[in-house]
């Protein structure tokens, strides 16, 4: 088996099952890590701070979903990753995606660490979503 200790496999399975609102996910992950004796205080505090920052900007954070199974398909991502979606007449459409990639420049030959974040915004999809929702 990939993970020999069934207790560890159970914790991983429970963690990967966390999915729902971001606030609900934080609560579930805090409980899971506390019960398992895993210290994730700093990353969970960072996520809470991100949500608070979004709330201070007027973002409805109750509409932000979290899925522990989510990940971007690029190996250079090293931390927080995200996608922004909207719903159009044909269903969900991705508007943007990105994340943190602190080792990418070293992978490309930089001789020292360079922290980096970035995203791709699909402008034509954003404009189409705004038009569909009655925006300019």
Question: Where are the model-predicted features located?
Answer:
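Positively charged, Gly/Ser-enriched RNA/tRNA-binding surfaces
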Residues: 1-136
């Amino acid at each position: 088996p990939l993970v020999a200790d069934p207790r560890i496999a159970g914790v991983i399975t429970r963690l990967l099952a966390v999915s729902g609102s971001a606030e609900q996910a934080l609560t579930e992950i805090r409980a899971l890590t506390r019960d398992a004796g895993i210290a994730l205080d700093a990353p969970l505090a960072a996520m809470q701070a991100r949500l608070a920052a979004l709330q201070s900007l007027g973002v409805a954070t109750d509409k932000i979903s979290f899925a522990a199974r989510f990940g971007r398909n690029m190996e250079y991502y090293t931390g927080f990753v995200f996608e922004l979606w909207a719903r159009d007449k044909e269903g969900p459409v991705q508007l943007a995606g990105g994340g943190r990639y602190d080792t990418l420049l070293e992978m490309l030959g930089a001789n020292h660490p360079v922290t980096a974040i970035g995203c791709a915004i699909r402008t034509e999809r954003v404009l189409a979503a705004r038009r569909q929702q009655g925006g300019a």
